Amino acid sequence: DGGSALGGDADMTWDKTNNTITLGGTDTEAVIKGVTNEPSAPSSGNLTLYTKDMGGKMTARVKGPSGAAFPLQDALWQGSQYVWTTTGATAGLWTNTVGAGAGTFTAQTSVSTSPYTAMKRSRWANVVTTTNQVLGQRNTDATFYVGTNGGFFYAARFGFDVWTNGGRLCACMHTATTVVSSNPSTIANTVGFIIDAADNGLISFSTRDGTTLNKTSTGLTAVTGKGYEVQMFIPPGGSTIAWSILDMNAGTVASGSTSSNLPVAGTFMTAGVLASNAALTPVTSIQLGVSKIYVQTDN
């Protein structure tokens, strides 16, 4: 017939003639449970809508017949978005904030060898002899914090055109402009993905308050020619931060959450993806590539 009740309730009807589902009643809503496994690509002419936990943030996603999936962007007029993108110059382009690049900059030539090498990115490398150089990109306007009215969603895509064990990494929120001039795990009020000089490239998720460190291995390791997509999320007033990291080349994902030793509430931090050659003195011992940094807040 032209219309019928679904689930025995007239508030949800299916109009077979017009192929329309109607949610009636008062204060209607549709709740979609987040997937554990990515759905298959739909057939030609169709689009799959679903939800997924991305770094602790439940996100609406769509997938087309090509198999490519992407999240739906929140309204730009609500909350705040802070974005860095590569432009072919060391500064790149920050939106809604200001920032700075550091290290010997070169524009990349994309090649199709892997998802990382095909990615448009800026690159920064160390010069010869000088130790503990800061390489990469960060915003310089301390804007982000945990606690009441704080919280943030952070995402970044980066990797290494050259990685040598003994280097450092901090894809993170931090208060110190020299967060990788020493081991990032020693810097107060820092949260994110780090490598200390003695870690031999092992990437950890780290939180540190004013004094105490909490450091958890992701199981993924920095390798020359490999890229990573990282995310972390803590809601306003939240006491737990969730995280995820994707090995872009292998497709391997690690995730977790922690409530231990978060940065001191109300301490303003900056966002960045930074690396250092630490004690490595040969030129280009470390060459960091960064494609994008994205931070979203509710205020």
Stretches found by the model and what they are:
Residues T164-T175, I241:
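Beta-strand acidic-aromatic groove motif in beta-rich domains, primarily in extracellular
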Residues D1-S80, T87-T90, A100-A102, T130, ...:
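Extracellular repetitive beta-rich solenoid segments
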Residues Y154-A156, G225-P236, I241-I245:
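Short tryptophan-centered beta-strand motifs in secreted/extracellular beta-sheet-rich domains
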Residues A156-F158, A171-M173, I293:
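Short hydrophobic/aromatic patches on beta-strands that form ligand-binding or substrate-lining surfaces
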Residues S257-G289:
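Flexible glycan-contacting loops in extracellular carbohydrate-active proteins
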Residues A254, S285-N299:
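Extracellular polysaccharide-targeting segments
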Residues Q73-W163, G237-G238, T297-N299:
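Low-complexity, Ser/Thr/Pro/Gly-rich disordered linker/stalk regions
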